[in-house]
């Protein structure tokens, strides 16, 4: 990769970060984020030279925070500044004048939680997990920390095996339960898969190869499965979108171990969702109407049936 190409990539990531930041609406907001970025990159804020890898890490983690977790300007500013605060190269008093009290509070939380993390190395301790998950008053502290760990997991293949194992232990005991607690189910599922990939690489590879080997037949089966429902929904004038996905490797392995069966004996390895476009007052009736159509086409399994219409999940 040439220097020019790298420069363009960094600029593109920075612009993408600004676009994905939902509450970035004014020129002043953009100025503050740019100020935080420039501060993070400056020699005065770093004990050693900033590398291209450092910049990509910062921007990629920022995109996780905005695009995948849904946080905004304040969290991005804190992400950009907290390493300099943690190293002592930048003081909270210096930050307060430019960025305000809320940024200082979150940065103080990040500094303290990093200290706890560095001084409590027994990550599979229940006391440590409770301490870390309940420490900060502002949940954005923990969400920023979570985003950094997700970045580490996504790039764990470059780590030595012992560091990979340590990251897997942390992920299993701390970050997966935390993501679940906050309803970040996509992040939770990805972390479970990545923890399995580096924690049990042979098992992960075996299931991955089997999924790939059955992909074409599975896609054909799913298309045939949803076709009669789609036709009936259209005939009834139901507005909807349909999405389907193969379940995660970690989820499949959990089923195999729970039921003590082989991969070939797991039949529900994909999930289909019909998302209705309904008005609030008609939503419940439309859901029951849709369920009736599906039940007419395919016999429900009472043991696997969950009534989220009458008793919705706590996260809605």
Residue ranges and their predicted role:
Residues 80-109, 184:
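Hydrophobic or amphipathic alpha-helical targeting/insertion segments
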């Amino acid at each position: 990769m040439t220097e020019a190409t790298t420069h363009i990539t960094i600029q593109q990531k920075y612009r993408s970060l600004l676009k994905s930041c939902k509450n970035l609406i004014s020129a002043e907001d953009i100025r503050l984020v740019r100020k935080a970025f420039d501060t993070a990159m400056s020699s005065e804020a770093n004990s050693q030279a900033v590398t291209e890898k450092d910049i990509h890490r910062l921007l990629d983690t920022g995109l996780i925070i905005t695009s995948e977790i849904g946080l905004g300007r304040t969290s991005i500013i804190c992400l950009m500044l907290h390493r300099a605060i943690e190293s002592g190269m930048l003081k909270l008093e210096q930050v307060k004048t430019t960025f305000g009290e809320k940024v200082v509070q979150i940065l103080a939380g990040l500094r303290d939680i990093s200290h706890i993390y560095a001084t409590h190395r027994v990550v599979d301790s229940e006391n440590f997990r409770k301490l870390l998950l309940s420490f900060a008053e502002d949940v954005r502290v923990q969400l920023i920390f979570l985003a950094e760990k997700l970045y580490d997991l996504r790039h764990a293949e470059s780590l030595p095996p012992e560091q990979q194992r340590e990251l897997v232990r942390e992920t299993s005991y701390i970050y997966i339960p935390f993501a679940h607690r906050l309803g970040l189910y996509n992040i939770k599922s990805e972390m479970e898969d990545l923890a399995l990939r580096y924690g049990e690489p042979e098992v992960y590879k075996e299931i991955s190869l089997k999924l790939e080997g059955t992909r074409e037949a599975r896609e054909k089966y799913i298309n045939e499965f949803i076709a009669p429902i789609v036709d009936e929904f259209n005939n009834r004038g139901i507005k909807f979108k349909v999405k389907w996905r193969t379940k995660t490797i970690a989820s499949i392995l959990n089923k195999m171990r729970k039921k003590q069966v082989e991969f070939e004996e797991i039949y529900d390895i994909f999930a289909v969702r019909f998302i209705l476009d309904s008005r609030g007052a008609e939503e419940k009736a439309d859901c029951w109407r849709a369920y009736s159509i599906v039940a007419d086409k395919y016999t429900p399994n009472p043991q696997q049936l969950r009534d989220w219409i009458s008793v919705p999940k706590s996260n809605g």
